[in-house]
């Protein structure tokens, strides 16, 4: 627009067409924290926000930074665990290198398990080192998938939460990115190099869903039985039934129980 070349961020955002933009991209250069906060405060219909080569102050924070449907933050050194926990119904989130630790990611996954709402569909975080599943999934029920290469892992939301449309989370590390995919048990999933017409039977993750629910029931039953000398016979029979169901799923599925 004429006359806007040397305008301040406030001058730009004072123009109604920019305040109503659904898509905003910051390309190269750097931006001050106050200016970035101003954009987030004034952009009322923002659905797609991108930092593309733009340097962001390490102390930047804003409550709306992760309440946007689609996000690409190439400079993500400012991102904290608390930011990730504010995601709700995002579809696509991509972050560059962060200062997040394994402990942060583990807390993030535990929060996802117990979240009342779906947080995201796809989340990508740049991380060069391969993941250590024993640390990343510490104290979380998980399955290790053999159907994919490189290794992939599954966790599930708590069964007491009924409003989650996508209760399954697939986690993997490929091409220097830590990737999280949330979806329903009936989602049909194909790799890029897989032929969706190669089989008449559609592949879903129903078996993985069922196996994780059984693991959850077993964990709750074991906790109930802890420290009891004379175990309830009904509980013991129930545990045996769950073992049989789980073994059947393990025999037919391409996954193992994560340890």
Can you name each region flagged by the protein language model?
Residues 1-259:
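Non-core capping and flanking segments associated with repeat-based/extracellular domains
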């Amino acid at each position: 627009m004429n006359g806007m070349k040397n305008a301040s961020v406030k001058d730009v955002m004072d123009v109604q067409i920019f305040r109503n933009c659904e898509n905003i991209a910051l390309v190269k250069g750097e931006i001050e924290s106050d200016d970035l906060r101003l954009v987030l405060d004034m952009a009322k219909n923002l659905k797609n926000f991108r930092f593309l080569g733009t340097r962001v102050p390490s102390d930047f924070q804003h409550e709306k930074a992760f309440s946007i449907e689609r996000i690409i933050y190439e400079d993500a050194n400012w991102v904290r665990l608390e930011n990730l926990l504010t995601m709700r119904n995002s579809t696509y989130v991509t972050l560059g290198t962060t200062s997040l630790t394994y402990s942060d990611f583990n807390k993030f996954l535990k929060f996802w398990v117990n979240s009342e709402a779906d947080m995201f569909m796809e989340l990508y975080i740049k991380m060069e080192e391969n993941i250590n599943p024993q640390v990343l999934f510490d104290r979380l029920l998980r399955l290790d998938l053999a159907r994919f290469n490189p290794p992939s892992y599954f966790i599930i939301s708590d069964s007491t939460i009924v409003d989650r449309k996508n209760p399954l989370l697939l986690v993997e590390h490929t091409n220097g990115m830590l990737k999280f995919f949330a979806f329903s048990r009936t989602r049909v999933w194909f790799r890029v190099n897989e032929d969706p017409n190669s089989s008449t039977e559609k592949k879903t993750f129903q078996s993985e869903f069922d196996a994780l629910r059984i693991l959850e029931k077993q964990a709750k039953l074991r906790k109930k039985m802890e420290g009891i000398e004379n175990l309830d016979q009904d509980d013991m029979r129930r545990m045996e039934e769950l073992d049989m169901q789980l073994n059947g799923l393990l025999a037919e599925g391409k996954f193992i129980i994560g340890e």
